[in-house]
């Protein structure tokens, strides 16, 4: 069985919701899925005043466990077109894994959330891809076989780089991931799990 890690950071719950959909899609493809979050860096009192969602059920990940999975799907909100500092801090600790080639050949993928339609979804995903490539991972996106990313009848996230959602309703209020955005997240989870399973099976045949 293929092992998939959905590793995310979420301030207000939007990426957490997308992570659950990604995990569902990976399970539908037959993968064994773990959902983990990275540690929060914001002091608890500050996070509480800012309204952060602090009751997230996913266990906190450790850097060392990344090597245990065949695929890692990363979810992060955008911060000025880049990943959140919480995710960057976590990934910056993978130097030991990098030095030992522990993540080389594993599948990596990224999804995100932004506050606005043009808030840096693609640059956030692509800049995170850079880290995955340095770690030697095989980067997988959200192919156009997911037709939902081509919709023109509604404002929606999603691009060939990865699933995404918009967190602001345009009037400063909260917007939750739409049905189409969640469909994209599930599709990405299935797609990554299927590719990882094919790679694992191929390597087992070569080793036999």
From Swiss-Prot:
List positions binding FMN. Answer: 10-15, 78-80, 113-119, 134
InterPro entries noted in UniProt: Flavodoxin/NO_synth, Flavoprotein-like_sf, Flavoprotein_WrbA-like, FMN_Rdtase-like_dom, NQO
Kindly list the GO CC terms recorded for this protein. Answer: membrane
Which Pfam families does this UniProt record tie to the protein? FMN_red
What does the entry's cofactor note say about binding and number?
Binds 1 FMN per monomer.
Binding sites annotated in the UniProt record for NAD(+): 12
Instruction: Give UniProt keywords alphabetically.
Output: Flavoprotein, FMN, NAD, NADP, Nucleotide-binding, Oxidoreductase, Plasmid
Per its record, how is this protein called by name?
Answer: NAD(P)H dehydrogenase (quinone)
Q: Any keyword Cell wall biogenesis/degradation?
A: no
Give the E.C. number(s).
1.6.5.2
This protein's source sits in the domain of life called Bacteria
Q: What is the lineage of its organism?
A: Bacteria, Pseudomonadati, Pseudomonadota, Alphaproteobacteria, Rhodobacterales
Q: Which GO terms describe its molecular function?
A: flavin adenine dinucleotide binding; FMN binding; NAD binding; NADH:ubiquinone reductase (non-electrogenic) activity; NADP binding; NADPH dehydrogenase (quinone) activity
According to UniProt, the reaction catalysed is:
a quinone + NADH + H(+) = a quinol + NAD(+); a quinone + NADPH + H(+) = a quinol + NADP(+)
